[in-house]
Structures are given as C-alpha cells and as structure tokens.
C-alpha cells in the first residue's frame, strides 16, 4: 500500500522531529544511558533516513544488557544489517517477520516503504529490463502487485516474456558555469592555497 506524497511529506517532518527528540533524550539521559524505547525509536529512525553510520554507532553505544533484554532492538538491528548488505528481499522479510510494538510499527512500515521507493529508483537507473520475478523480490511485493506498480509508474511490462522495462528517470539538467565564473573560482582557490 503506497502512501500519498502529502502524507509521506507530513510523516517525514514528524519523523525528523521525533528523531531530534530521541537524540536529545539520549544526550540528556541520566548516566548517559537512555531508555530502551528511545534506543528502539532512534535506531529505527536512523534506518528510515538511511543514516547507516549513525545507526551503527548507536548500536555500538547501546549497553549490551539492553541489547540482550529487548529482542525488538535486535530485530531492528537485523533490518539495519540487511540494509547495510543491500539485501532488499532480506529487508522485507526481516520487517514482516517481527511483531513490532506500537511505537515502532509506523516507523518500520515507513522503512519498508522508503526501501521500496529506493529499490524502484535503483532499478530505473540500473536496468533496461529485469524479470518480473526478480523485480518483485527486489521491491518486496507479489509479482502481480509489482507489475501493477510499474505500470502506474509509466514503465512497460511484457507478460509474454515476463520482463519489466523501467522508464529512465528524468535527469536533472546540469547547470553550466560560465568560463569566467569557473576561472574566478579557480583563482580564489589557488590564492587560498598560496596564503
């Protein structure tokens, strides 16, 4: 189920605020150890924003007693490891295999949706054609639903061959810098290095 663009934008803002609050709570926690709920949310939010470095450092900071006593935290980290390994089918399997608590459920659904969007984008950039089965595994959807999704995106699907032909993304126009501006930048850079 795809979220509309406006709902996703609203959720993005609220998730960003929640991440800032969790980071603040972690910093202000007595003894430097936050609650497991803060760690759960913060780790999931880092994964949502594809901030894998902060997710890894957070995982290293979390005391091992909290890691071992809260299995949900391990489940979130398992999803993070799959993201790190770019194991897209594994990401979806890990997300759906766990019964998330109420305060994490919405974030993990957003992680799944963001991963699907990222997969759509990667396929559109990297492939001229891909089998519908491989594509469905890559985006974590049943084959019929994946083919329906590509047709909505303006892609082509051939039912006879079972292939999906992605539509190449519109490339952003390159802004050409006039030669004078480029020369001025180089001059400033060289002058900075000499001084």
Curated annotation (Swiss-Prot):
Pfam families hit by this protein: CSN8_PSD8_EIF3K
Protein origin, superkingdom: Eukaryota
Quaternary structure (record): Component of the CSN complex, probably composed of cops1, cops2, cops3, cops4, cops5, cops6, cops7, cops8 and cops9.
Annotated GO biological process: COP9 signalosome assembly; protein deneddylation
Upper lineage: Eukaryota, Metazoa, Chordata, Craniata, Vertebrata
Annotated function: Component of the COP9 signalosome complex (CSN), a complex involved in various cellular and developmental processes. The CSN complex is an essential regulator of the ubiquitin (Ubl) conjugation pathway by mediating the deneddylation of the cullin subunits of E3 ligase complexes, leading to modify the Ubl ligase activity.
Subcellular localization, as worded in the UniProt entry: Cytoplasm; Nucleus
Family: Belongs to the CSN8 family.
The name this protein goes by in its record: COP9 signalosome complex subunit 8
PCI domain sequence ranges: 10-183
UniProt main location, coarse: cytoplasm
